[in-house]
């Protein structure tokens, strides 16, 4: 594993243990060259998922992009990184275990909304406003009501 501080290729694992969600291994590493310490996570990838965008274009699912979406919605909100990681891991686990190799971006968006609703109401509204491209104040009320109804019915069925 490359050191994120100095770029050295030779880092050592000092501690390994299951992460809180039991879907990954948390490893504490140290770089013998610069003394930098950092944490990595190792996960099982069950299958490669393709995301079907609104335009019909297909792209490889990117877990990091999902994490960034949560981080943007939760910016300056009092939500621990561990809770974000558990939410993302839960979504990825559901997607991978669904049996599908292709999933629409809308289905992923609904799962993100469902997770954000339980994490932070403000983040939920932030994400919904971008997800549904709000242009008027009324859009906030209308779309949140609609999304809540969809999530209550079935979070996997848009």
Swiss-Prot record:
Regions of compositional bias (Basic and acidic residues) in chain numbering: 11-22
Keyword list, A-Z: ATP-binding, DNA-binding, Metal-binding, Nucleotide-binding, Repressor, Transcription, Transcription regulation, Zinc, Zinc-finger
A biological-process GO annotation: negative regulation of DNA-templated transcription
One GO MF term attached to the UniProt entry: zinc ion binding
Record has Transferase as a keyword: no
Zinc finger annotations (unnamed) as residue ranges: 3-34
Domain ATP-cone, residue spans: 49-139
Cofactor note: Binds 1 zinc ion.
Start and end residues of each stretch annotated as Disordered: 1-22
Cofactors that this protein relies on: Zn(2+)
Classification via InterPro entries: ATP-cone_dom, NrdR-like_N, RNR_NrdR-like
PANTHER family linked to this entry: TRANSCRIPTIONAL REPRESSOR NRDR
Primary role: Negatively regulates transcription of bacterial ribonucleotide reductase nrd genes and operons by binding to NrdR-boxes.
Similarity comment text for this entry: Belongs to the NrdR family.
Protein name, UniProt field: Transcriptional repressor NrdR
């Amino acid at each position: 594993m490359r050191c994120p501080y100095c770029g050295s290729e030779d880092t050592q694992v000092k501690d390994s243990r299951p992460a809180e969600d039991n879907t990954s291994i948390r490893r504490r590493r140290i770089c013998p060259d610069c003394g930098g310490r950092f944490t990595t996570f190792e996960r099982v990838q069950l299958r490669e998922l393709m995301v079907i965008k609104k335009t019909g274009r297909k792209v490889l699912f990117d877990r990091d992009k999902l994490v960034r979406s949560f981080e943007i919605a939760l910016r300056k909100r009092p939500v621990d990184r561990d809770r974000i990681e558990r939410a993302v891991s839960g979504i990825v686990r559901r997607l991978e275990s669904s049996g599908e190799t292709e999933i629409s971006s809308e289905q992923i968006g609904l799962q993100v909304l469902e997770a954000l609703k339980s994490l932070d109401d403000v983040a939920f509204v932030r994400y919904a406003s971008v997800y549904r491209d709000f242009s008027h104040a009324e859009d906030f009320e209308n779309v949140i009501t609609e999304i809540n109804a969809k999530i209550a019915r079935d979070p996997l069925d848009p």
